[in-house]
């Protein structure tokens, strides 16, 4: 009996309703269906009294989800896709993402096209697009305090009502650099259209084997986004602030103290997205972000009073 998974956003009633209907339909068609919510992929939130809420990377995989599963259907928006990616990437399960959210930059199709999408996926009429992920670790000495998979970005920033931060950052074997800013972002190509883009980073197409380091509100005109090979690991040391906040994929994270360091490297895992038509990144940029659209015609003269 073939296996399929369903991961849905349990905050959205429509996603939960469709998930139950889809489970019944696929079970009747002879599939072994495992269903879970994306809450299992949400990283624990810490607090000053308990600064680290640690779940091992392979500890997020839901019951019934394994490498024998043909694919997993994700019902939600981009946040649901990010959470689901952490749940299934260690098992290599492909994701068919159905948008029930807002922008749906990472999703493949919309809810009104669900029946056709399921039929096409069951028939195997699709391509797989792999997206690189990061492994993020918080180390104190050689002990791992916290770790997570990251599809978009890791953000390290100051708390409200605190002063500017200094970060000592070492990329690969290169000499460390000091960056003064409100925070720093380390982003994958997938994350280059998210927080990194808003902070002034470039758009990087998904197939480029690169990472980028983007300062947030830097205190220097010379501190600009840096793109470098994803074979280079990154170590970040806080210098002058008693406590920093780290957030992964806008989802959760932990506090970072002066005795800690944040270590990032390209993960051995990747997210496998089911594409029902050949992936066209520039089309998505146009449709979702308005990139490259023609300028609106403007009048050549203005009549003043």
Swiss-Prot record:
Active-site residues (renumbered): 78 (proton acceptor)
Highest taxon of source: Bacteria
Reactions mediated catalytically: NAD(+) + ATP = ADP + NADP(+) + H(+)
This protein's UniProt keywords: ATP-binding, Cytoplasm, Kinase, NAD, NADP, Nucleotide-binding, Transferase
Any single GO CC term annotated in Swiss-Prot or TrEMBL for this entry: cytoplasm
Xref: InterPro entries: ATP-NAD_kinase_N (IPR017438), ATP-NAD_kinase_PpnK-typ_C (IPR017437), NAD/diacylglycerol_kinase_sf (IPR016064), NADK (IPR002504)
EC number: 2.7.1.23
A Pfam family matched in the record: NAD_kinase
Residues bound to NAD(+): 78-79, 152-153, 182, 193-198, 251
GO biological process, one term: NADP biosynthetic process
Named cofactor requirement(s): a divalent metal cation
Compartments in which it is found: Cytoplasm
The protein's enzyme class: transferase
One MF term in the entry's GO annotations: NAD+ kinase activity
Family, per entry: Belongs to the NAD kinase family.
Known role: Involved in the regulation of the intracellular balance of NAD and NADP, and is a key enzyme in the biosynthesis of NADP. Catalyzes specifically the phosphorylation on 2'-hydroxyl of the adenosine moiety of NAD to yield NADP.
This protein's name: NAD kinase 2
């Amino acid at each position: 009996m073939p296996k399929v998974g369903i991961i849905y956003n349990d905050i959205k009633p429509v996603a939960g309703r469709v998930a139950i209907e889809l489970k019944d339909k696929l079970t009747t068609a002879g599939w072994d269906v495992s269903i879970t919510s994306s809450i299992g992929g949400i990283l624990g939130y810490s607090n000053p009294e308990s600064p680290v809420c640690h779940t091992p990377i392979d500890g997020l995989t839901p019951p019934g989800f394994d490498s024998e599963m043909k694919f997993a259907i994700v019902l939600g928006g981009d946040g649901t896709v990010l959470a689901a990616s952490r749940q299934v990437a260690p098992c290599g399960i492909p994701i068919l993402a159905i948008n029930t959210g807002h922008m749906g930059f990472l999703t493949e199709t919309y809810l009104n096209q669900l029946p056709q999408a399921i039929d096409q996926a069951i028939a195997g009429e699709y391509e797989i697009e792999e997206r690189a992920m990061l492994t993020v670790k918080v180390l104190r000495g050689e002990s791992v305090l916290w770790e997570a998979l990251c599809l978009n970005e890791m953000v390290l920033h100051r708390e409200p009502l605190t002063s500017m931060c200094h970060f000592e950052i070492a990329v690969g074997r290169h000499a460390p650099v000091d960056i003064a800013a409100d925070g720093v972002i380390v982003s994958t190509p997938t994350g280059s259209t998210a927080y990194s883009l808003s902070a002034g980073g470039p758009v990087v197409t998904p197939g480029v084997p690169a990472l980028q380091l983007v300062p947030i509100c830097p205190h220097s005109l010379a501190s600009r986004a840096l793109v470098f090979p994803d074979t280079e690991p990154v170590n970040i040391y806080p210098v002058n602030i008693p406590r920093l906040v780290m957030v992964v994929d806008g989802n959760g994270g932990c506090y970072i103290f002066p005795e800690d360091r944040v270590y990032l490297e390209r993960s051995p895992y990747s997210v496998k997205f089911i594409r029902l038509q050949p992936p066209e990144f520039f089309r998505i940029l146009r449709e979702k972000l308005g990139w490259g659209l023609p300028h609106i015609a403007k009048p050549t003269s203005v009549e003043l009073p």
